[in-house]
Amino acid sequence: MFLATLYFALPLLDLLLSAEVSGGDRLDCVKASDQCLKEQSCSTKYRTLRQCVAGKETNFSLASGLEAKDECRSAMEALKQKSLYNCRCKRGMKKEKNCLRIYWSMYQSLQGNDLLEDSPYEPVNSRLSDIFRVVPFISDVFQQVEHIPKGNNCLDAAKACNLDDICKKYRSAYITPCTTSVSNDVCNRRKCHKALRQFFDKVPAKHSYGMLFCSCRDIACTERRRQTIVPVCSYEEREKPNCLNLQDSCKTNYICRSRLADFFTNCQPESRSVSSCLKENYADCLLAYSGLIGTVMTPNYIDSSSLSVAPWCDCSNSGNDLEECLKFLNFFKDNTCLKNAIQAFGNGSDVTVWQPAFPVQTTTATTTTALRVKNKPLGPAGSENEIPTHVLPPCANLQAQKLKSNVSGNTHLCISNGNYEKEGLGASSHITTKSMAAPPSCGLSPLLVLVVTALSTLLSLTETS
């Protein structure tokens, strides 16, 4: 009786806990913008803020003068009370580029572009176990097909993809542009990247991850895994750019900047956690990693002998920024959170679902990526993906800030004073976590309290019976 009670009660409790941290009823930024523009007071403040951001870019208009800066700050403070300030986007949504443009226009700092860049995407809060429950595991599928040889999981995953209409459709859609030669080039890289993004956005994770994160025991399998994204077109180039230059290029594009911020947020390592991930969620890390594929920051396996990944870049010609460059590159290459997530998927395992993930207490700075604060002249306009200003600050996410500060109140962002002053940013630019989008409430909802109470009572009755 006791085990039966747990069997039915624990999934319900896990579902409710996931709902508690999902962010509530936040609007996507497109809907929030439309809603704001219909309200006179919100519309006025929103237009003022957009003029402030545009003016700051060109050192013109409202951005000049103390009075103008006060007006800009007033507009931002007023918008904090609106749904627009707390809006998010969904990866692969119909108007994703427009949504991200609105999001970043809201989160541009007017005092040095140093706002903490949390992920612009609505949290998914999924689990690898959720993916495994969708259909039988890949090896189980092929137990029903006698003529298919066993042993190469990546080959099995590719064949499983061909048996699924959606996976087959989108895989064919990227194979064609990624392998077709165009004039003197190997392929049309732009079309290849777009098709790859659609593949990982549209195809169920069961199949796309099966090809990208399959577990291997031999070189033939690992090489097939490395070739999944057709790296000769989507990944490799004649020369490797400097990683910091590649990062700058990524930050000028709404999609790339957002996917990179999402990766830093969801794959942040933490050695004291059960999974080596700060957020204790392998599925979210793998989703964030796959989201980078099809951008200029496309990562891939470095070779066929390890799970180390990296973008196509190195740290040559870094000059005084060598340490910063290596920190950025090693976030990919030596990321224990990502490696554990890949291994967990390949093994069909997951972070212990029912174990409560208590915050890791630490007073030391959380390892973060080398995200440079730098203002650059604007490039030519015309692309809907282009971003006017492109800055990624040292913190990867709000949760890292909480771990560093050991509190959940109004603390300054986790930017070390040395790095902050080195970049020439004044102390007045500091903001508090309270000024950011409000984090999910840590309090239990009445519904959850009721369920927990009922569960406790039920368990007590089963023990006494």
Swiss-Prot record:
SMART domains: GDNF. Residues 430-465 form a propeptide. Pfam families: GDNF. The keyword Disulfide bond applies. It is found in: Cell membrane; Golgi apparatus, trans-Golgi network; Endosome; Endosome, Multivesicular body. Sequence repeats lie at residues 25-113, 150-238, 239-342. Glycans are attached at N59, N347, N406. Belongs to the GDNFR family. Interacts with GDNF ligand and RET: forms a 2:2:2 ternary complex composed of GDNF ligand, GFRA1 and RET receptor. Interacts with SORL1, either alone or in complex with GDNF. Interaction between SORL1 and GFRA1 leads to GFRA1 internalization, but not degradation. This is GDNF family receptor alpha-1. It comes from Homo sapiens (Human). The lineage of its organism: Eukaryota, Metazoa, Chordata, Craniata, Vertebrata.
